[in-house]
């Protein structure tokens, strides 16, 4: 299951990718209209804190939408949403490991990956969505090193 965060009609929502389609299930709307679950998290962060139970809740909502006579109403085409980063804002700093593979260390000017682990943090505001414009801050730096390697595995 690939969970996505997005904005539609100025509302931040989340849901899983629709299999074999360029669309996402609006699980927030499914729960709102079909009232499948007794309790459902309001944000993706709240859901992630539930662990595997959250994955099961999302599966139940998608199953209910697929069985509903007008279940297609809960699918939103990618062209109708504004992408957000998978986790729009983390509650704490993000721990990172720098130069953790040889090719990256070499492209940064080293001969090989360092022997000792290189840990640093990123602010919650450092997260950007796919295709988002990144601020350059030319008054502070003349180059950026950006990578897209954020993942959460539940289960």
Give the positions of each predicted feature:
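N-terminal non-catalytic cap/leader segment that marks the start of a structured domain
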Residues: 1-113
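Glycine-enriched loop-and-adjacent helix/strand subsegments that border the catalytic/binding cleft
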Residues: 91-155
